[in-house]
UniProtKB/Swiss-Prot annotation:
It comes from Listeria monocytogenes serotype 4b (strain F2365). The gene is ecfA1. Residues 6-240 form the ABC transporter domain. ATP-binding (A) component of a common energy-coupling factor (ECF) ABC-transporter complex. Unlike classic ABC transporters this ECF transporter provides the energy necessary to transport a number of different substrates. Belongs to the ABC transporter superfamily. Energy-coupling factor EcfA family. This is Energy-coupling factor transporter ATP-binding protein EcfA1. Forms a stable energy-coupling factor (ECF) transporter complex composed of 2 membrane-embedded substrate-binding proteins (S component), 2 ATP-binding proteins (A component) and 2 transmembrane proteins (T component). Its main location: membrane. One of its GO terms (biological process) is cobalt ion transport. The keyword Nucleotide-binding applies.
């Protein structure tokens, strides 16, 4: 197996003036190009991990490695050049008068030559489907469009890792769908590692692997299917399950045979059709 591109080993962290660890002996990893979802209730430690990965916080103990770099004050900027973050509130992320100015802002801070900057801005906006809005004011965009521009700003920096810190939690269903589809396409085209911090369990279904956090520790880990086959264990720590899992549970409770756990409505319909055809 290839070496993990993102790695935390026995990481501990607690905030000032608190005795309880926000992150306690956490060891997790992600491969290049993998989509990993971190889920958990408020206070589970998932957002603290996001800040640790980007060097916004430093662990009290343990190791954090991104690519070839181990997180330290000496190489913090090497880490940040590899990791881009998209935050919860899109309105708090804009600094430019126009969409293209905003996407260019990070490149200017990195001293990218003008010609290269123009190419990267155009490419990033094309990738998220926002090139036609290049001269628009960010404030006039919808929530989903704003987050797509925020993603373009991160993409223009050409990071190896993108962290989505509750990036869809303030969006309506349409905006959420736009952003998740953008991330899916971007990951496939650029081979970027995606780490999504979320409490939206339907969003988790996009991930290759899920890490469930509880009280600062790793509670469980597996594919979305493996995790949601243990629906009762999720509920025991205050988490729900996606709608598609609830639907299967209700069908079973109503006397219908649904077969193995599936993660999409299409797959469930196919499974029900096959089972019905056999009877």
């Amino acid at each position: 197996m290839a070496e993990s591109f993102v790695r935390l080993e026995h990481v501990f962290y607690k905030y000032e003036d608190t005795e309880k660890y926000a992150v306690k002996d956490v060891s997790i990893s992600a491969q290049k190009g993998e989509w990993v979802a971190l889920v958990g209730h408020n206070g589970s430690g998932k957002s603290t991990i996001a800040k640790l990965l980007n060097g916004l916080l430093f662990p009290e103990d343990g190791l954090i490695k991104i690519g070839h770099f181990v997180l330290s004050e000496k190489n913090i900027w090497d880490i940040r050049r590899q990791v881009g973050m998209v935050f919860q509130n899109p309105d708090n992320q804009f600094v430019g008068a126009t969409v293209q100015d905003d996407v260019a802002f990070g490149l200017e801070n990195h001293g990218v030559p003008h010609d290269t900057m123009v190419e990267r801005v155009e490419s990033a906006l094309n990738e998220v489907g926002m090139q036609s809005y290049a001269l628009h004011e960010p404030a006039r965009l919808s929530g989903g469009q704003k987050q797509r521009v925020a993603i373009a700003g991160v993409l223009a920096l050409q990071p190896d890792v993108i962290i989505l810190d509750e990036a869809t939690s303030m969006l309506d269903p349409r905006g959420r769908a736009e952003v998740m589809e953008t991330i899916r396409i971007m990951r496939e085209q650029e081979d970027i590692t995606v780490i999504s911090i979320t409490h939206d369990l339907d969003e988790v279904l996009f991930a290759d692997r899920v890490i469930v956090m509880n009280n600062g520790e790793v509670h469980s880990e597996g594919t979305p299917q493996e995790i949601f086959e243990q629906a009762d264990a999720m509920r025991e720590i205050g988490l729900g399950v996606p709608f598609i899992i609830e639907l299967q549970e209700k069908l079973v409770a109503g006397g219908f045979e649904t077969g193995s756990t599936v993660l999409s409505e299409g797959a469930l319909l196919d499974q029900l059709w096959k089972l019905n055809s056999n009877n």
